[in-house]
Amino acid sequence: MAEQQQRAAELRSLLNRAAHAYYVLDAPVMEDTLYDRLYRELQQLEQADPSLLSADSPTQRVGKAPATGFHSVEHRIPLQSLDNAFDHGELKAWHERLLKVLDRADDSPLPLVGELKIDGNALALSYRHGVLERAATRGDGSSGEEITANVRTISSIPLRLQIDDPPEWVEVRGEAFIPDDTFAAINNERAAHGDALFANPRNACAGTLRQLDPKVVAARRLDFFAYTLHLPSDHSNSPECQWDVLAWLEQAGFRVNPNRELCDGLNGIERFCDRWEQQRHQLTYATDGVVVKLNDLRLQDEAGTTQKAPRWAIALKYPAEEAPSKLLKLAVQVGRTGAVTPVAEFEPVALAGTSVSRATLHNADRIAELDLHLGDTVVVRKAGEIIPEVVRVLPELRPTGAVPLELPDHCPECGSNLVRDDSEAATRCINSSCPAILRGGLRHWVSKGALDVDGLGNKLIQQLVERGLVRSIADLYRLDAALLASLERVGEKSAANLVAALEQSKQQPWHRQLYGLGIRHIGEVNAKALAAAYPNSASLAAAEPESIAALHGIGPEISSSLQQWHANPPNQRLLEDLRAVGLSLEANTSELNANSTGEGNSSGALLGKTLVLTGTLPNLSRSDAKTLIEGAGGKVSGSVSKKTDYLVAGEAAGSKLSKAESLGVEILTEAELQKLLST
């Protein structure tokens, strides 16, 4: 038995080293035939004695499919997005903001790291004692889908870190992608089988990662570049700069993009960006820009983050690809607030790997600015290689007698006159019964940030409105399962589930109901502030505009919007209808209790306090903790600074803990936070 254990360990080590040399270093050290023979030997040993199986065995890269799809997991450390710059001017403006945040008055350059921005899919890899424990997609940044079985098939991701005495945990972040030649082979195979082709490698990669069968993932040969990591705060010899982070990742067995550069200040970074803008088409994978990072990790912590992105990094996106096309039509879309958006429809063109045939024109002013005529040849590009836009017209190619384009005078959905307020650029339909406004309002009411009703998608909403079954939000709650089941593509079970979900949504808190009403200028954050100050719709409707405007973060624009909305008779009837079908439109007991210790009570324990969360709390998810803190009048920040009042630290707290200790910030456990909330 001891001999078999030793032999299995030897084989694992040999095969993993060979795989790393082949897939990561691109320097094979073992013949394929020998690799196959040793692989089969290890496989036979493990089959004969399953106790020899280990998580880092190369035979375990392709496992069984998950029984019931993917489940959501919370990231130990959130995956933030990056702010974008689209030219050197915006890059310079970011650099100036960074210098200001760091209070750098001298002229000494800041060392910056330039890394190619891979056009793939972000992954979060969790290692426990050096062994890959979990892999997840970015998701919304706070949580993502757990796809460990699929990620284990990516040969450039080590199943065991190739370092001695690994930390208790390591979080590695990077980008999964499909190389160009692999993508071409995948599409060729799909074409041969009569399957729809993938539009671009990024879409193919995203679809592959969500395959339920890991064998399909393995066959598509995804690749991976690692670009950052997180270690326990007490780990010795942690990297002190981004350049060393990349070296650490390489030493641990990850593939790191070799096309990177440590630059002494902004000028060097600009040269790096210009070079790769010219050379990117020579690469064997897709890249859509350069990521610029402050090299010093201590200064990164000092710079901190906003709610969405780090201040110490930015993505400089390559100039968009452009292509000419013939303008065929001006379409018009009506949104839930009645805003009319003109859309240019043109002959399909290929841009940044996708076929594009439509682009928003935003408003009537943009149509006039471009001087658009039917049949014009227009130049189309993708801003940030994502959003199509018409950038200019080629008037020299304009057909004789071409008719100028302009917005219609009447709503294309209901025929009402369109109006435009002199104070804004938007043209609007002001008919509250307009089907387009109703559809948009229904979609907003059931959206995730509002009442969060599962099972009510766009096509079903379209049916309900077209058949006259729903004429207001309140009508949703008058639907029964039998009626829903009679509609196209709605089964009895789906109908019953939707009725149950609608009934359950009546219990959503008052601030979600307020947000769901879709009042102009009121987002989720403002709705929370208003709901905390006014515990029901009646008190909000009766409030003086000056009192509303005086609330923190509200102001006269929102106050005026609320006053206009409540003065509209159809909206008054809507509130009455919602109460009639069982919506409270008021704060429940738990909300009132939270508000009594929060912004509405000057004695609230966390009123005006700034807290930072780090690590994994034993009982509360990060989102739950944030909700409790905000309910008690506190603010949750993403980074530690001199303005931080408390750091709430859980298991595996990261660098935020050490920074808080160095600044003298008070450290709380979850239990201490709960005690503070209860005072």
Swiss-Prot record:
Active-site residues, as the UniProt record annotates them: K117 (n6-amp-lysine intermediate)
An annotated GO BP: DNA repair
SUPFAM superfamilies recorded: BRCT domain, DNA ligase/mRNA capping enzyme, catalytic domain, Nucleic acid-binding proteins, RuvA domain 2-like
InterPro entries hit by this protein: BRCT_dom, BRCT_dom_sf, DisA/LigA_HHH, DNA_ligase, DNA_ligase_CS, DNAligase_adenylation, DNAligase_N, NA-bd_OB-fold
Keyword terms of this UniProt record: DNA damage, DNA repair, DNA replication, Ligase, Magnesium, Manganese, Metal-binding, NAD, Zinc
EC number: 6.5.1.2
Protein name in UniProt: DNA ligase
Species this protein is from: Parasynechococcus marenigrum (strain WH8102)
Lineage: Bacteria, Bacillati, Cyanobacteriota, Cyanophyceae, Synechococcales
